[in-house]
Amino acid sequence: MIVDTSAIVAIVRGATHAEQLAELLVDATAPKMSAATMVEVNAVLARRLRPEDLRRVERLLDEWEIELVPFDTEQAEIASRAYLDFGRGSGHPAALNLGDCYSYALAKVRSEPLLYVGDDFVHTDISAAHRP
């Protein structure tokens, strides 16, 4: 299972289905996240949380044993294509942001479902790890 920024942010902020998402992470076998996605997680949460809360998030990620996967050339090519095909401004209903494309690319490369929140990825060819 690949983990998108939206799932982490939803859990941390206590959004709808946060408990279900957290349970999926606890029960997951070898969850993964792109290293590029981790940058996005930190950027998004740094604007919303105090430093001590950010450290709590880091501990949670460690507890969930999410493997950070280096962002490589293959992922870069897939993410670039995804942005052209599904990105904001493309006219496609997915309207993925750049960070979404990093998660999309890793899910494609690894042929694994993506844990996300929202209605953007549902308009792509990625399989979902969770349906609320």
Predicted regions, residues:
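Short loop->beta-strand "edge-of-pocket" segments that line small-molecule binding or catalytic clefts
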Residues: 29-32, 64-69
